[in-house]
A protein has these predicted regions:
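Preference for long, solvent-exposed alpha-helical segments and helix-linker "stalks"
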Residues: 511, 544, 592, 603-645
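Glycine-centered tight-turn motifs at strand-turn-strand junctions
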Residues: 473-565
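Beta-propeller blade termini and top-face loops
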Residues: 1-438, 445-448, 482, 486-500
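Short acidic/polar inter-strand loop motif in beta-rich domains
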Residues: 538-542, 577-585
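Beta-strand-rich binding/interaction modules
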Residues: 134-135, 450-451, 458-476, 571-575
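Mature extracytoplasmic or organellar-lumen-exposed domains after removal of signal/transit peptides
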Residues: 587, 620-726
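Low-complexity, Pro/Ser/Thr- and charge-rich linker/hinge segments at domain boundaries
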Residues: 399-426, 584-618
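Contiguous beta-strand segments within globular domains
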Residues: 428-463, 467, 525-531, 609, ...
């Protein structure tokens, strides 16, 4: 950015970078020249002092990416080059409760390049672009140039454009493909390359009329390059290739021979943005043909089931106002397709015969690429989108869409089979959370996601229960559950009134933007989503006991954490009850894959946690029984019971115990013993590690305390009345 103060006689640079910021617009306030707004490929910046200093564009989610890929880390990272801001790999989940700059790293790929994380080592990211192939090692920060010809250019290397495909074989993790106008193959992680195709671009170079005055009378030279490549997940011998001048070619013998299978309706200069080889049939493929360069703004998606001999255009239902960019097949459900255009994302449940919008909460933006992330390492089923101007987006949990596709639009009341849940902690950033001014992206929900459908509005309450493999009830929710406190996210005025009357109420003193809206089981017709936090049932009258914790707090998403242990990894049953009828589905809960604690230590942790929880629950239940009997007693009997179960203070504690919270002084009561046992349990919940000697000792003390007060209660508790014989 340049400035002149003498009518253009001389100029001075006031803002820019060695790599070029690509400024597109500038605005100066008409009456206050101190105020300047500049916009570039990265975002907008503002100066209030005539350009002496500027705000930064990292406050805006304006990343313009060309492609999107994921690695095999946990949590998985989403990678791409981005326009004039370098490359990026960003975690799909953060341990800090929200995704911030701490969770991303550059990968030294050219801005328009394609990332190809090593499937066997997620710390290594290969990248493609016009200058070849790069290999970035996150551990060292070093980048090596490892393309087919990293020094020379010309016919030996071939022609290329900005976004050159670079992709690993889905059937052989040692095979890497790269393209120019020919296809290259490496079997040793880019140390050596072999050319496995001829020139796959068009051999006639007619310039379309849309070139207008830019057309030349000189006979055009060959210019096409490969812009789409898809190795088959069913056969290592099958590859599909598409070019930026409108060719689709396929090989079924590993590149020995290629066949041009371009649909007759695809015109020269059509850019094949991507091809998706079928996940269930090696003869199937889908293609996204982008016709922007020939002044055709309509979407064009294609499908073949016979090696490209015949093609069907599959656009019905897609808005006719944006070109095609990407198409993907769900790897779990045949015929379930996802498509991206220059405006939004679409979904088809019937192999492309019909499409419907899947935009949801995404902005209207050019979606350049989409990927279905579903494998054993991520323990997920997500749709990842890369946009040209709004960064990355992830649709978490494709299971409801998959069930609809399998049943072709299932009706009625049912529970969707949940995907495997991973027991992770939502946030571990202690003790001070990131301020709300820090740009951040949302974490996916922590816990088990449970989707259910109601055919009609429920006549009564709806109940959702989690049952373990032994049949024991672990957690229960009801649409009639009381609300803990007025919800500041939904009723701030009422929340303020409660806090004014009782400053000791839960979360009072916090700004209203911290707590998350409380979950409520929906009772109206439709498809609904609920989350089990993978903890045991809270102990006490209110099943939603809990407060916003400082650790892991996130603006607008801070959960009221139940003061109960984590449920152990294993098999569970989800049971939905509506109008007296129950619907069930199995649920598997897994440990965080990053945990390396030996099984014996994990078993000890689970056993002690459950034992302390059971002791706390038993002691609290006895306390409630004792309090129920107090009014019917008098004299010494009443005094003895009250010594075990004294009345709670006017303002009872919000929770029975917290990690590290000391038990009240002796003599112990039923409630203090319950608090001691729960405190011992909660002290072990911060990490999936074997209990320490101190924690085991605390459990031993709590066990003895609970057993002692329960024994005293049993001696005082009158036997149940027996009915008289008549």
């Amino acid at each position: 950015m340049w400035r002149t103060e003498d009518g253009g006689t001389s100029w001075s640079a006031v803002r820019g970078s060695p790599g070029g910021d690509d400024y597109q617009r500038i605005w100066i306030h008409p009456t206050d020249p101190n105020l300047i707004l500049a916009v570039s490929d990265q975002g907008a910046v503002v100066s209030s002092n005539r350009g002496e200093s500027w705000s930064n564009w990292y406050t805006q989610p304006t990343a313009a990416v060309y492609h999107v890929t994921t690695d095999n880390a946990f949590p998985y990272r989403v990678c791409s080059g981005q326009q004039d801001s370098g490359s990026i790999c960003v975690a799909s989940r953060s341990d800090d409760g929200e995704i911030t700059f701490h969770d991303w790293h550059p990968a030294n790929i050219q801005e328009y390049g394609i990332a190809a994380p090593d499937p066997r080592d997620p710390e290594v990211v290969f990248g493609s672009a016009r200058r070849g192939v790069s290999r970035y090692d996150r551990r060292t920060g070093q980048t090596a140039q490892v393309g087919p010809d990293s020094a020379a250019r010309g016919e030996k290397f071939g022609r290329n454009v900005r976004t050159m495909p670079l992709i690993w074989s889905p059937v052989n993790p040692n095979v890497l493909y790269y393209t120019s106008n020919v296809v290259w193959k490496s079997v040793d992680r880019a140390h050596t390359w072999t050319r496995i195709s001829p020139d796959l671009a068009r051999q006639t170079w007619t310039v379309p009329a849309s070139a207008g005055r830019y057309a030349s009378s000189v006979t055009p030279a060959p210019r096409g390059a490969i812009t789409a490549l898809s190795p088959s997940p069913k056969s290592g011998a099958v590859l599909w290739a598409g070019t930026d001048d409108g060719n689709i070619q396929v090989t079924t013998d590993g590149g020995a021979t290629w066949k041009n299978v371009t649909p007759a309706a695809i015109k020269p200069w059509t850019r094949i943005f991507n091809i998706e080889a079928g996940h269930f049939d090696a003869r199937t493929a889908y293609a996204a043909a982008n016709t922007l360069r020939i002044d055709d703004m309509h979407p064009h998606f294609w499908r073949t089931h016979d090696d490209g001999r015949t093609w069907t255009e599959i656009n019905h239902g897609i808005a006719d106002n944006a070109v095609a960019n990407s198409i993907r097949e769900d790897p779990r459900v045949p015929g379930l397709l996802y498509a991206a255009t220059d405006a939004q994302v679409w979904v088809s449940l019937d192999d492309g015969a019909n499409w419907q919008s899947l935009r949801l909460n995404m902005p209207a933006i050019s979606v350049r690429d989409i990927q279905v992330k579903d494998d054993s390492t991520c323990v997920c089923a997500d749709l990842v989108a890369g946009t040209h101007g709004r960064g990355f987006w992830i649709l978490d949990g494709l299971t409801p869409i998959r069930q609809l596709a399998r049943s072709r639009g299932r009706a009625g009341t049912y529970v969707v089979t949940p995907q495997t849940a991973v027991r992770v902690r939502f946030g571990t950033n202690e003790p001070t959370p990131w301020p709300p001014e820090l740009p951040a992206a949302q974490n996916p929900a922590a816990g088990a996601i449970i989707d259910y459908a109601l055919a009609a509005n429920a006549a009564g309450s709806v109940k959702l229960e989690i049952v373990d493999a032994s049949g024991r009830l672990i957690r229960s929710y009801s649409s009639d559950d009381p609300v803990l406190d007025p919800d500041p996210a939904l009723d701030p005025a009422s929340y303020d009134r409660v806090c004014q009357k009782n400053p000791g109420a839960a979360d009072c003193g916090l700004p209203l933007y911290w707590p998350a809206p409380q979950q409520r089981l929906a009772t109206h017709a439709g498809l609904h989503r609920f989350r089990w936090d993978t903890r045991y049932q809270p102990i006490g009258d209110n099943p939603r006991t809990g407060e916003v914790e400082a650790t892991g707090a996130v603006p607008h998403r801070s959960e009221r954490t139940p003061v109960t242990p984590w449920a152990a990894p294993g098999r569970y049953t989800v049971r939905l009850t509506v109008e007296g009828k129950s619907y069930t589905q199995p649920l598997t809960l897994r440990l965080d894959p990053r945990v390396k604690t030996p099984p014996a230590g994990l078993r000890q942790l689970a056993a002690l946690s459950r034992e302390m929880y059971d002791l706390a629950a038993a002691s609290h239940a006895a306390y409630l029984q004792a309090r129920a009997r107090v009014d019917s007693l008098s004299g010494a009997a009443r005094a003895q019971v009250e010594s075990l179960a004294p009345a709670a203070p006017a303002r009872a504690p919000r929770a029975l115990a917290r990690p590290g919270q000391p038990a009240p002084a002796t003599p112990p009561t039923l409630e203090s013993a319950s608090r001691a046992a729960l405190a011992a349990a909660m002290a072990m919940q911060d990490a999936d590690v074997a209990p320490t000697a101190a924690q085991v000792a605390a459990c031993t003390r709590a066990r003895a305390q609970v057993n002692a007060v329960l024994a005293r209660w049993r001696r005082l508790e009158p036997p149940p009345r027996r009915s008289r014989r008549r």
